[in-house]
């Protein structure tokens, strides 16, 4: 009886024509406004950096790195997804009709579900590309310098869009199916009837794990860079002029600071996506016979949508001064802990060299 009740409730949600009484567009309106505003602010900040980079001399033109190119593509993807998805929901609330009834042959429902799966996958692929770029930059610098270029980053976006388009078009080819969910303001992959939803969720999980693995590798390499720079302080400081060891050490410190800033930004975006994807992942792996609540399904979708709202605000808030503050807080204890050890090591080496001279 319980399974039959769940099946009938699911079928009612899939074919419902009118929204239930009391449904409010307030949350959807706030999410749409926050998403558009945040992405526009982030794009404006990135555009200013692009203009500043164009105005720089050739020797300083590396200030806009490949990482910032990928961030620009991520923000553009989030803005495009917000502008193409949210208006459909607002139109449904305005007409008090479900997505199935909003257009003939459930076209609005199919469009919404396809766009939702497409932009969610594209966002995760962009985060993976950013994490892979950091991994190659830190872990394999020679390969990175020879094979990876800033102009090559411009090709990442169309490649990601092509992959996402092919994967998300499978339900249109009868592998999987897009259906409407309660209260009728959103559509997604049919739950439990095919393996496509589990395949989609598994792909997102694999991408999240890959991003976390790349970030962990970057953290280990940054720790090694910190230890090397700490040991180099014990060496002679001769040739502090241009091109000397002093200049090299300053360049290493600047490079490490920039990499740490990029890692902080990428780590926060990755954690955000992982947290926002968790309810959807639980929703995807739940059994069809379990008692799923309408509100839980809707909250899972909203959590997945929130990621495209948070990402640009993270970039807009974490400006270089804020990143420097966070870096100083994160590194303060390590520096204080290692300062005494560094001085002790340096004095020990100095005493040993004096005894050798005697």
Swiss-Prot record:
PROSITE patterns in alphabetical order: G_PROTEIN_RECEP_F1_1 (PS00237), G_PROTEIN_RECEP_F1_2 (PS50262)
Expression tissues: Placenta and lung.
Disulfide linkage: 109-187
Gene3D superfamilies registered for this protein in UniProt: Rhodopsin 7-helix transmembrane proteins
Pfam families: 7tm_1 (PF00001)
Compartments, record wording: Cell membrane
Main location (coarse class): membrane
InterPro entries: GPCR_Rhodpsn, GPCR_Rhodpsn_7TM, Prostanoid_rcpt, Prostglndn_EP2_rcpt
GO molecular function: prostaglandin E receptor activity
Keyword Cell inner membrane part of the UniProt annotation: no
Keywords: Cell membrane, Disulfide bond, G-protein coupled receptor, Glycoprotein, Membrane, Receptor, Transducer, Transmembrane, Transmembrane helix
Location of region: Disordered: 231-253
Glycosylation sites: 3, 6, 96, 287
GO terms under biological process: adenylate cyclase-activating G protein-coupled receptor signaling pathway; cellular response to prostaglandin E stimulus; G protein-coupled receptor signaling pathway; inflammatory response; positive regulation of cytosolic calcium ion concentration; regulation of cell population proliferation; response to lipopolysaccharide; response to nematode
Lipid bilayer topology: Multi-pass membrane protein
Topological domain ranges for the Extracellular compartment: 1-23, 92-111, 177-198, 287-299
GO cellular component: plasma membrane
Spans traversing the lipid bilayer: 24-47, 66-91, 112-132, 152-176, 199-223, 263-286, 300-323
Cytoplasmic membrane side: 48-65, 133-151, 224-262, 324-358
Keyword tRNA processing: no
Family named by the database record: Belongs to the G-protein coupled receptor 1 family.
Function: Receptor for prostaglandin E2 (PGE2). The activity of this receptor is mediated by G(s) proteins that stimulate adenylate cyclase. The subsequent raise in intracellular cAMP is responsible for the relaxing effect of this receptor on smooth muscle.
The protein's name in its UniProt record: Prostaglandin E2 receptor EP2 subtype
Taxonomic source organism: Homo sapiens (Human)
């Amino acid at each position: 009886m319980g399974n039959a009740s769940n099946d009938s409730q699911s079928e009612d949600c899939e074919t419902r024509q009118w929204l239930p009484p009391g449904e409010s567009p307030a949350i959807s309106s706030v999410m749409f406004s926050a998403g558009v505003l945040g992405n526009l602010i982030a794009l404006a900040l990135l555009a200013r950096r692009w203009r500043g980079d164009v105005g720089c001399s050739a020797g300083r033109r590396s200030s806009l790195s490949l990482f910032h190119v990928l961030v620009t593509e991520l923000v553009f993807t989030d803005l495009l997804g917000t502008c193409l998805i949210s208006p459909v929901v607002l139109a449904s609330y305005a007409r008090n009709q479900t997505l199935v009834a909003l257009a003939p042959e459930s076209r609005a429902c199919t469009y919404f579900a396809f766009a939702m799966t497409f932009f969610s996958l594209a966002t995760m692929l962009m985060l993976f590309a950013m994490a892979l770029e950091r991994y190659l930059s830190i872990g394999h610098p020679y390969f990175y310098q020879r094979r990876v270029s800033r102009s090559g980053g411009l090709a990442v976006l169309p490649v990601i869009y092509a992959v996402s388009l092919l994967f998300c078009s499978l339900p249109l080819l009868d592998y999987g199916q897009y259906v409407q969910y309660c209260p009728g303001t959103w559509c997604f992959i049919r739950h439990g009837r095919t393996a496509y939803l589990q395949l989609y969720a598994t792909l997102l999980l694999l991408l999240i794990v890959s991003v976390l693995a790349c970030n962990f590798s970057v953290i280990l390499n940054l720790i090694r860079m910190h230890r090397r720079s700490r040991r180099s302080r014990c060496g002679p400081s001769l040739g502090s002029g241009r091109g000397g060891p002093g200049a090299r050490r300053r360049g290493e410190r600047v490079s490490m600071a920039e990499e740490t800033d990029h890692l902080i930004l990428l780590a926060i975006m990755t954690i955000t996506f992982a947290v926002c994807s968790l309810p959807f992942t639980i929703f995807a792996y739940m059994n069809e016979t379990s008692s799923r609540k309408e509100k839980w399904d809707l909250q899972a979708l909203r959590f997945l949508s929130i990621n495209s709202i948070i990402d640009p605000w993270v970039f807009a808030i974490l400006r270089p001064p804020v990143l420097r503050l966070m870096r100083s807080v994160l590194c303060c204890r390590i520096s204080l802990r290692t300062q005494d050890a560094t001085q002790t090591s340096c004095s020990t080496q100095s005493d040993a060299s004096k005894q050798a001279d005697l």
